[in-house]
Amino acid sequence: MAAAKGTAIGIDLGTTYSCVGVFQHGKVEIIANDQGNRTTPSYVAFTDTERLIGDAAKNQVAMNPQNTVFDAKRLIGRKFNDPVVQSDMKLWPFQVINEGGKPKVMVSYKGEKKAFYPEEISSMVLTKMKETAEAFLGYTVTNAVITVPAYFNDSQRQATKDAGVIAGLNVLRIINEPTAAAIAYGLDKAGQGERHVLIFDLGGGTFDVSVLTIDDGIFEVKATAGDTHLGGEDFDNRLVSHFVEEFKRKHKKDISQNKRAVRRLRTACERAKRTLSSSTQANLEIDSLYEGIDFYTSITRARFEELCADLFRGTLEPVEKALRDAKMDKAKIHDIVLVGGSTRIPKVQRLLQDYFNGRDLNKSINPDEAVAYGAAVQAAILMGDKSEKVQDLLLLDVAPLSLGLETAGGVMTVLIKRNSTIPTKQTQIFTTYSDNQPGVLIQVYEGERAMTRDNNLLGRFDLTGIPPAPRGVPQIEVTFDIDANGILNVTAMDKSTGKANKITITNDKGRLSKEEIERMVLDAEKYKAEDEVQREKIAAKNALESYAFNMKSAVSDEGLQGKISESDKKKILSKCNEVLLWLEANQLAEKDEFDHKRKELEQVCNPIITKLYQGGCTGPSCGTGYTPGRAATGPTIEEVD
C-alpha cells in the first residue's frame, strides 16, 4: 500500500469501545471495521494459537476470560499502587502484576506466560483502528489525532502518546474528548454568534462534563469535571449483581465465583441494558448458565432505573461543578450535547433535561461517534486541510488541574490555574529562604489543594550554583510552559548568573523509556507478523478444504453421469476423502503443508477435470463448479455465548 502524505485520521481510544474517522471530500467518514461495526471493542485476547483484537476478542471472552484484556485505559499512565488500579484489579478476570512500580497485564499466549504494559495493549487497539482506516482508504496512514478524557493527567497523556508510537502512528496531537465532541458539534452549527455549550459525555468507563464557548469557529473550554470511574460498565455491574442475587434466590446457588458464568451473564446484561433504552422490558435467556441450570428471566426499565438510581443522580454533581468553575448560570447554557453510548438511557436524559428546566437536549450527533468525528476534523486541520469547512476552526484546550510549585512551609503556589487555556506560559520570580543558600529545589505539583502534600507531585529538580547572598536577594525566574498536547516544561533560571535548569514533566518514572518504546515497537511488528502468518495458514487450510469439497461435489453431480468414468470418479473421491481425513487430524499444520496437500490433490484432479472440459462439459457443475479456493461449504460461523 502506498502512503498518502496528506491524510490523517482521528481516533477515539475509549475505555470499552474505540472509533476512527477521517475527513475527506469536505466531510467526516466514520469508518466501519471488518465486522461492519462503526465502533470496535477495546479488547485484546491471547490464545494458544493467535492474538485477537476488537470484536473477535470480545466474542470469545466467555471461553477465555483470563487472557482477554480490556479496560487498559484504566491502567495507562498509572502506578501499580494507585488506589484506582488496586480497586479495579478486584473486578478484572485477568491478572495484573507489579513490575518496578508499574502495572503489567499477565496472560498466557501460545503456551507461554507473557506480561504486557498497558501502553502495549492500547497500542494493539490503536493498530486495529489504523488498519480499519487503511482498509477503507486503500493506503497506509501514519498521522493521527488521539483523544483522552479531559481529566487525564500528564503521565496518562504521555502514555497514550507512547501507545500511538508503538502502533506505528505519528501522533499529531492528543486532544480532550469533550473538545473533540465540541468540534464535531461546532462544525454543524457554525456562524451563530457566541454559544455556551455543555457537553455531557457518559461512555463505557468514564464520565466527563465540559463547559465551552464556541464563537465564530473558536472553541474555548471553560471548565471540565467528571468521574473517571462511572459509565456503562457500572450499570452492567448493577444488573449482574441483581441477577446473581436472583439466581441465589431461585436456585440456591452462588455463581459469583464462576468467571465464565459471570461473563456470560454480563454479556446478557449489556444486551438487556441496550434493549431497555428503547423498550420498557428486556428478557434474558441463558442456557446452562451454571451447573446445567438454564436461566430465563426478565427485567423492566423501571427496575433497572431503581438499581442504578444513585449512579444516574450522581451524574448531576459534575454538571453543577463544571458550571460553578465556569462561573456560569445554567440558564446561560445554549446547548446541551450528549456524547457516549450511555447517554441513550432515557432516565439519564430525563434527569439532565429536568435539571435544565425542560430544555431540549442535542442528540443530533451519534453519541458513539462524536469524539472520533471531532478528532478527524482536528487531524485534517493539523495536516493543513484548506477546505472552507475546517479553515475557520481554532481550538483552545485547557489544563485539567492547577500546576504550581512548593514554597516555604509546604504551600502550593500556583502558576497555571486549573482550566487555563493551553498552550500557555507563566513566569514568576522566586527567591531563597535562607542566607547564602547555594541552591533551590523546584518541586512541581498538580492539584487544587492549598498544601502540596495533598496534591500530586509531577517531578522535581535542583537549581544549584547560586552565588552566596542574603535571603530574599537572589532572583530565580521560574517558567511553566504547557504545549498544545498538555505536556509541561518547567524552567528555573538564576537571573544574576543566567544559570538555568529545566524539566519536562513526563511524570517522574511513570513513562516508558525510549528503549522500552523501541522494543515495544519491534514487539508490535513481530506480533503483527505472527498474526499475518496465522491468517495465511488459515487461508491455506480453508482453500484446501474448499477445493476438496468442491471436487467431491463436482464429480458427484447428476449432470456428469456418463461424462466421467467410474474409475476416475473413484480416484477423485478417494483422494478427496483422504485429504479431508488428513485435515481433521492436522488442524494445526503449517501453511506449506496445506499448500503441498492441495498440489497433491490437484495433481490427481486436474488431468481428469481437463479431460472433462475437452470432452465438452455441459452439466450444471461446469465452469465455476470447481474453481479452486472457493469458500468451504462447511459452517463458517459459530454461536457466541
UniProtKB/Swiss-Prot annotation:
Keyword line: ATP-binding, Chaperone, Nucleotide-binding, Stress response
Segments of this protein annotated with the region Nucleotide-binding domain (NBD): 3-388
Pfam families, alphabetized: HSP70
Spans annotated as Substrate-binding domain (SBD): 396-511
Gene Ontology biological process: binding of sperm to zona pellucida; chaperone cofactor-dependent protein refolding; positive regulation of protein targeting to mitochondrion; protein refolding
The keyword Nucleotide-binding belongs to this UniProt entry's keyword annotation: yes
Top-level taxonomic group: Eukaryota
Record-linked SUPFAM superfamilies: Actin-like ATPase domain, Heat shock protein 70kD (HSP70), C-terminal subdomain, Heat shock protein 70kD (HSP70), peptide-binding domain
GO cellular component: cell body; COP9 signalosome; cytoplasm; cytosol; nucleus; plasma membrane; zona pellucida receptor complex
InterPro entries with a match to the protein in the record: ATPase_NBD, Heat_shock_70_CS, HSP70_C_sf, HSP70_peptide-bd_sf, Hsp_70_fam
Binding annotation for ATP: 14-17, 73, 204-206, 270-277, 341-344
Gene Ontology molecular functions: ATP binding; ATP hydrolysis activity; ATP-dependent protein folding chaperone; heat shock protein binding; protein folding chaperone; ubiquitin protein ligase binding; unfolded protein binding
Subunit structure: Interacts with PRKN.
Domain notes: The N-terminal nucleotide binding domain (NBD) (also known as the ATPase domain) is responsible for binding and hydrolyzing ATP. The C-terminal substrate-binding domain (SBD) (also known as peptide-binding domain) binds to the client/substrate proteins. The two domains are allosterically coupled so that, when ATP is bound to the NBD, the SBD binds relatively weakly to clients. When ADP is bound in the NBD, a conformational change enhances the affinity of the SBD for client proteins.
Annotated NCBIfam families: PRK00290.1 (NF001413)
Family: Belongs to the heat shock protein 70 family.
Stored PANTHER family: HEAT SHOCK PROTEIN 70KDA
Annotated function: Molecular chaperone implicated in a wide variety of cellular processes, including protection of the proteome from stress, folding and transport of newly synthesized polypeptides, activation of proteolysis of misfolded proteins and the formation and dissociation of protein complexes. Plays a pivotal role in the protein quality control system, ensuring the correct folding of proteins, the re-folding of misfolded proteins and controlling the targeting of proteins for subsequent degradation. This is achieved through cycles of ATP binding, ATP hydrolysis and ADP release, mediated by co-chaperones.
Name listed for the protein in its UniProt record: Heat shock 70 kDa protein 1-like
